[in-house]
Amino acid sequence: MGRVRPRYIKSLGEKLLEMYPDKFTDNFEENKKAVAELADIPSKTVRNKVAGYITRLVKRRKAQEKAESAA
C-alpha cells in the first residue's frame, strides 16, 4: 500500500491542474519544470511531490477517458 499525500499537496496540485491543464503531461520531468514556473514553492521536495501528484492525476484521467471511449 502506498503513502498518503498531505492535503496541501493535493489541493495545490489540483488547483494548478485546473488553472493550467495544457501545461501538464504524463511526464514527471516536464511537470516538475512547469510547477517550478507556475508556483512559488521554495522546497524541492514539495515541488517534486506536487509534480508527482499532478503526473498521477493526468495519467488517471487519460486511462479513464480511454476506458470510457472503449466502452
Swiss-Prot record:
Q: Which family does it belong to?
A: Belongs to the eukaryotic ribosomal protein eS17 family.
Q: Does the keyword Ribonucleoprotein apply?
A: yes
Q: Per the record's keyword annotation, is Repeat included, yes or no? A: no
A molecular-function term among this protein's GO annotations: structural constituent of ribosome
Keywords, sorted A to Z: Ribonucleoprotein, Ribosomal protein
Xref: Pfam families: Ribosomal_S17e
Q: Name one GO cellular component term.
A: cytosol
Q: What PANTHER family does this protein map onto?
A: 40S RIBOSOMAL PROTEIN S17 (PTHR10732:SF0)
What protein name is recorded for this chain? Answer: Small ribosomal subunit protein eS17
Q: Which GO terms describe its biological process?
A: translation
Q: Which domain of life is it from?
A: Archaea
Which PROSITE patterns does this chain map to?
RIBOSOMAL_S17E
